[in-house]
Amino acid sequence: MSGLTHFDAAGHAHMVDVGGKQETQRIAVARGTIRMLPATFELIRDGKAKKGDVLGVARIAAIQGAKRTADLIPLCHPLALTRVAVDFELDDALPGVHCIAQVETFGRTGVEMEALTAVQVGLLTVYDMCKAVDRGMVIGDVSVTEKRGGKSGDWKAQA
């Protein structure tokens, strides 16, 4: 298990010690998609969902999700985030919605988990607010698309 940082030599899970790492600017971007029926897409696009502003509520939920990541992922370090930006892109061709989250901090560990959690919580909120009209929505294609900072350097997913 030498390549997995969250396990010790005996194979027991532990929280990684980041105390000796240098503090640097850390940035991560993640994205994901929720696919839905055309009628559901139209409700969101036209702002006519019964529960209100779907994407506005989902944006706040995504930000809250990023802030609460350490409460949800057992071995994730609690971080003082300096920025969480969440955007939604409507995609007529799917039909569906893409969620993109960029999370930043100045610290000793990356913010990939916070960006992924923001995207998932944002998309789950879209599902929650629209499930009365479309229980068949599908969340998928969630991934980190970019990370910057830290000892391992910068990384960007292949397009």
UniProtKB/Swiss-Prot annotation:
Domain of life: Bacteria
Pathway linked to the protein: Cofactor biosynthesis; molybdopterin biosynthesis
Tagged with keyword Membrane: no
Record has Lyase as a keyword: yes
Listed Gene3D superfamilies: Molybdopterin cofactor biosynthesis C (MoaC) domain (3.30.70.640)
Intrachain S-S bonds: none
Catalytic reaction(s) noted: (8S)-3',8-cyclo-7,8-dihydroguanosine 5'-triphosphate = cyclic pyranopterin phosphate + diphosphate
Protein name from the UniProt record: Cyclic pyranopterin monophosphate synthase
Organism: Burkholderia multivorans (strain ATCC 17616 / 249)
Lineage start: Bacteria, Pseudomonadati, Pseudomonadota, Betaproteobacteria, Burkholderiales
Gene name of the encoded protein: moaC
